[in-house]
Amino acid sequence: MLKGQKEGEAEPVPEGDKSGAGSSPSGVRKGLRVPLGLVSHSFSSLAKHKEAERRLTDEEESLSSPQDREDDAASPNIMAKSIAGLLTTASMYVGIGDIHRAEQLATGQPETDAGADETEDEMDEAGDETGDDADAPATGTDGEEESRPVSAQESRRSTLFELSIEPHPESHTAQASRTKNRRSRMTSKLRSKFNLDDDEELVREYPCWLLRDVLIQGHIYLTSRNLLFFAFLYKSNGSARLTGNLSICNNGLSISGISGKPTRYWTVLKDHTLSLYSSSTDLYFPVLTIDLRYVTKVQHCKNNGKDTRQFHITTESKTYTFYSDNEHSARSWSSALKKQVFATQNSDNDSMSVRIPLSNIIDVEEQAIVEQGLTLRVRVMESSDSFALDDYFFMFFNNAGSQLKELIQIQVANLEMLGAANVDYARHPLPPDTEASLPAVASDAAPQDAAIASEAAADAAAADTASHSPSTNAEPRARGRSTERAMAASAYLFGRLTSPRRDDAKQLSPSKVKLRFRSVADTLKLTTPRQPGSDAPQEPEPETTILESRPRLNYWSPRPFTTMRSMWNAQPVHYAAKGMSLFADDDELMIGDEAELLAADKRFKAHFSLTDDESLVASYYTYLNRSMPLYGKIYLGKTIMCFRSLLPGSKTKMILPLHDVENCYKEQGFRFGYFGLVVVIYGHEELFFEFASQKSRDDAEYVILKIIDSLKPVDGVMADDMSAGAYSLKAAQGRDATTDAKVKLFEQRISSVGYDIPIMVEDNPFYKTTITPKKFYTFGMLTIGSRGDVQPYIALGKGLLQEGHRVVVISHAEFGDWVRSHGLQFRAIAGDPAELMALMVQHGSMNVGLIREAASTFRNWIRDLLETAWEACQGIDVLIESPSAMAGIHIAEALQIPYFRAFTMPWTKTRSYPHAFIVPDQKRGGNYNYFTHVLFENIFWKGINSQVNRWRVEKLGLKKTNLEFMQQGKVPFLYNMSPTVFPPSVDFAEWIKVTGYWFLNESSNYVPPQALLEFMAKARRLDKKLVYIGFGSIVVKDPVKMTMAVVEAVVKADVYCILNKGWSARLGGQSQKSIEVQLPNCVYDAGNVPHDWLFPRVDAAVHHGGSGTTGATMRAGVPTVIKPFFGDQYFYANRIEDIGAGIALRKLNACTLSRALKEVTTNTRIIAKAKKIGQDISKEDGVATAIAFIYSEMAYAKSLIKAKRQEDKKAAKEAKQIQNEDSWLLL
């Protein structure tokens, strides 16, 4: 203890010794050599006894038709060197005080300061990007410094991320009802669930991190005889954890047209599977599915010490090689896969636990991590006979580890005095009756009996550990990791957690040591720092020891076939699935042999990588008709319908959740003598099957319909049964959508210094771990155009504002008051959006006339835009720009700041969609689509390059550039559109993200006029369809004629219309503006009404097809008619028609509009499709997804800036050399 330090406080680390190097002969029994070059040292003694008791009481919560001849009325007008240094370099903070503060928040107590936890971020190098300097003042156009919008920013600690634990709202009431005897009740639950002795007592509990293949956040509990660790792992809720495009190269798979050539697929990481699909819209037919339960290794490849874009996934039978678009993406995929593999193979009921008897602890050593934290290495012996050792690394903060170490010493000393002997775990299995106890615990944790969060968490912890019975749950969790004896031992001692083995040559005989798993040193590569040129290109290492191989399945059939005809005419087969009673006991199609039943069920799960919760119900031989009839077999499970091709050379599989099936019905077959069955899927094309016998077809229809009915919730029955078990899942799903992205950014910071370790933040249903960035960026959002172009940026800006950042919207001056009303800063740029709108409407699409007029008329317009944009972007740290603004990529290069693009229409090169400004009248294929992007890019640059290059040289101080040097295809790109409307293309790069719409909800402050409400009520009272018609700020040649056509169409369609005559508001003559059309009683001129308030209250909508308006109608599930005028509106009109949610109206007059109104208000297919799309979009959070993408791609965006700077330096150096050579030649 240092001089002047109070008892119970942590010793400060000397300024010159940040690594915590020191020495102290602290060991529980016999001091062993510190691994991996670590030096152990001592920390402060224990706190006072009363302080310990108080903290213990406060911390127990944690457990817990042909075209008409009429004219178009809408025609347009004009870790450093060791494990100890791992987190020192990353500056992570999490503390025991977070639990304490969470309890105080939950119980209404005044919050106390947990102490100063400031640490320096040692990873930032001197002279790093200016984007890192978030303290630079944001300067407005008036030159005054603007203040931060969130005052709480100033009080945050200077760490890379703060991990603060906050209670879920559901646990607030439970927290307030805690009682004094909670400690005894917790001890009782631990005793019963962990099979502890009756006299065993809980001594202390701490939050900590367990270092394995991943770094896991959890809690550790010290009892009088055991050391227990518990953590909630990722929930298996069916949602995708990571999606994107990957290329796979594997000669053993027939998924590539050319052997050995990488093929690109849409990849989805979800629960225990990694699935590859041909496209992001065909998610029922996987090309390849890798079961993570059988993965033995995930390896991110390096070449000469540098990360590559390649990674391997090794299973028990083969190795798959994947290629991503860049090394950042490869690192993200490998990290996510490691965490998911760990959670899949070590989780029981979405949690994991470790149990270490104190009598088997050989040594406890401590190492410093951060100024107020350390790591405890606990070395444990399996038994006195085997001499097998396990090393466990527990990381603590706020010096809780030092206190725990001394408590362990005390408890071990007490056990030695009592003569306690080592426990042989292989001979002492857990009682089998404790299996699957967590559901009962979840029931206890329901809201009606969630007395204390800590007790519920303790129940879950105990249930998880108690369910690790080797005799009942030995498969398939920990495969290929250990010998049978070691597996049996660890199943008792450590649950399902596989652990590394280390041998100490000085103390143990090599013949008696079992090398069960690669060590932490092998996993983290921490013994030596990364050195360029030191590593050869890595190949996957072969697994030398496998505990048990994945079962090789024999193709058994319950009815042996003698001819191919007998197989085609085979009868259906029924199976007695557990928990379902669809068939009679005397069913002649039922399999009666128990062995045959189990074998068929096992094959079913193996074919489609299903979990043990699924069971086979029935199977049928059939043809699947897609592009051509494909013969195979249908498997019906309890909740799933699968198909597998039986034709040689074909590997087609289908996995269709029956929750997505709306109906199925009988139909005639395409071929004579066959019987058809149509399966109707929500939001998807129907599937058509043909059966050789009518009996099989009818039976399949009956069974499918019965299963669908059983999956529908029954009021008052299923809801009650599920409420308790779903409580913890619901609470855990409240996790912030940006959490994983922030963890990814944190992992990238660690990886930048040479270490690769995924981090798993605990998915605790009772406490929410929030991660707050250390650095607060000033985000600049540059856009031009109409109100619809600015609105998404306001929504995104408000989301970034909640994250603690500063946001500046840079656009036309007329939007300033609107932007500021939402709490965002605003800076004006030149340009009249009405003039731009008139130009675009006059030409409609990209053509020579548009280019010529723009070059002559808008030369000064573009010049002023570039100059004012440069001035407005001063002082920002990250720039997000609509590429139509033209200036952003050059400004970001000059300011050396990260640069993102965001847009509402197709802009990046792809074969799936044409460029929004060159949309053909009919689909022309992928080559044409790609050509439109190349054509537009060149035309667009040709029109502005001379002005841009002059501006670059004179104003920005940069050299001239061209399309090749700009590398626009590498810029991180956000599409603020729904993937339901704009599915991401397979050829999109990993840095292109379709996030979902950025909705700006303004209905909360809107008070509708009484006349509008009465009009809507009258329409409902008369049983009339209510439609909205409005075209935003579109400029038309004759607004009066257009209004008359709209009114006549409404009367013909016999509907009621809410009208927004925005088309007569801009650039119209005074005579036109003064002429008004007399509106009938069925038309109400409402003006501007917030879309999020109005659209859910109407039956259909007619609009111009702007991105924002299209998103609002799709979000509300409203059938839509789009009359496009220019640009991306044609694209959206086609998309809405393609997905079946509306009609694209090429010509607007009374006849065409009235027919369209009748169609969208009466066609049940369009209505149902729009409703389904609305349900899908309502589940999206576009702003949160965009923020997560920005966090995850920030490192990549910075790397682009660095690369450009290095290229400039290299070019300048070469130019200087050439100049010197020329000078010498002149001499």
From Swiss-Prot:
GO terms for cellular component: cytoplasm; membrane. PROSITE patterns: PH_DOMAIN. UDP-alpha-D-glucose binds at residues 786-787, 789, 1060, 1088-1089, 1091, 1104, 1107-1109, 1128-1129. Residues 188-229, 602-668 form the GRAM domain. It comes from the Eukaryota. Residues 179-189 have a biased composition (Basic residues). It is a peripheral membrane protein. Residues 239-342 form the PH domain. GO terms for biological process: ascospore-type prospore membrane formation; carbohydrate metabolic process; lipid glycosylation; sterol biosynthetic process; sterol metabolic process. Residues 1-76, 104-189, 449-484, 523-550 are annotated as: Disordered. SUPFAM superfamilies: PH domain-like (SSF50729), UDP-Glycosyltransferase/glycogen phosphorylase (SSF53756). Keywords: Cytoplasm, Glycosyltransferase, Lipid biosynthesis, Lipid metabolism, Membrane, Repeat, Steroid biosynthesis, Steroid metabolism, Sterol biosynthesis, Sterol metabolism, Transferase. It catalyses: a sterol + UDP-alpha-D-glucose = a sterol 3-beta-D-glucoside + UDP + H(+); ergosterol + UDP-alpha-D-glucose = ergosteryl 3-beta-D-glucoside + UDP + H(+). One of its GO terms (molecular function) is UDP-glycosyltransferase activity. Sterol glycosyltransferase responsible for the glycosylation of ergosterol to form ergosterol-glucoside. This is Sterol 3-beta-glucosyltransferase. It comes from Eremothecium gossypii (strain ATCC 10895 / CBS 109.51 / FGSC 9923 / NRRL Y-1056) (Yeast). The gene is ATG26.
